[in-house]
A protein has these predicted regions:
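HIT superfamily nucleotide-processing domains
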Residues: 1-133
């Protein structure tokens, strides 16, 4: 049975699931920030995936990147797999704009997260679910 890292569980809200990955919304209202987590236990690196799952994950990254681009018309889409704190393989996909608080630097560690208010979270999740299923 697949287990999501407790830190990801604590810091995100579920949006949907794809063939390979769970799609999670980072609980930071300042950024359109999604995280893909492949439903495979014991993985920490991209190369830990088999070839078919690598291709599927790449497809899912493109789906999310294009969807965020349509929804938010960002200046840039950042895609990254760091894993220095949370070892479980997960991919961050963040729509960035020149007026966001961390621009042009990374969103990680810039400042404490600003959690979604309940109504804003419901609206954001509804839009994301409509876009991604």
């Amino acid at each position: 049975m697949f287990r999501l890292d407790p830190r990801l569980e604590q810091d995100t809200h579920g949006v949907t699931s794809f063939a390979l990955s769970r799609v999670l919304l980072m609980n930071d209202a300042r950024y359109p920030w999604l995280i893909l987590v492949p439903n495979r236990n014991g993985l920490s690196e991209l190369h830990d995936l088999n070839a078919a799952d690598q291709a599927r994950l790449n497809d899912e990254i493109i789906i999310v990147s294009r969807g965020l681009a349509r929804m938010f018309t960002p200046e840039k889409i950042n895609v990254g797999a760091l894993g220095n704190i949370v070892r479980q393989l997960h991919i961050h996909i963040v729509a960035r704009n020149t007026d966001d608080p961390a621009w042009p630097g990374p969103v990680w560690g810039h400042s404490p997260a600003v959690p979604y208010a309940a109504d804003a979270l419901a609206e954001r999740r509804s839009r994301l679910t409509a876009e991604f299923g």
